[in-house]
Amino acid sequence: MGFWSYYKEEVKVIRDRDPAIKKDIEAILYPSFWAIYNYRKAHKLYEQGKVFKARRISQRTARKTGIEIHPGAKIGKGLFIDHGHGVVIGETAILGDNITLYQGVTLGGTGKEQGKRHPTLEDNVLVGAGAKVLGSFTIGRNSKIAAGSVVLEEVPPYSTVVGVLVKRNDEAVPCYDLDQVHIPHPVQNELKRLSDENTKLREMIDQINNKIKE
């Protein structure tokens, strides 16, 4: 796609989703305009096996725009990244058509595993500011991820996801494996401990009742 064809498409995308734009020419002032344009060039090189050239383009673009899109990611038409600073899209991420991302969004992996390790977003998904979607699973079409949410598992189509899974955890966990997902959950651990104690108490009560009956 030539520059002017891209420009016309991007103007339409921005006008559809950002009321702040007043004139078409403003599109070139959006960081996402250049981030996505350069991603398309880098992705083509990446597919041709010219990995170093592709990575060089993506890293230079990340420094200039604050948006890091790995050239290996697969992205459909109509991606809109509003504001954009701090957005990260990983190597094996797959994005459908008409995706909207806000600043601070991470579409990341869960550690050092190989193969598909980043999320798949189907058509018309919106991911709010600061949301983190980590792992190899699918966010169903027409779903919305609320700002600040942390998503670690599959989301069905036409869903709304709200909330942060992060809780304070006092258990020591090794950080050298780069695993962001398989971390002991303090609330779940506490519930299990209480359940185990409850089971023991019931057993003690049953023993006492049996002795009384004797």
Please provide the spans of the model-predicted regions.
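Terminal amphipathic alpha-helical/low-complexity segments used for targeting or macromolecular assembly
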Residues: 1-65, 175-214
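Structural signal for interior beta-strand "rungs" in well-ordered beta-sheet cores
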Residues: 62-169
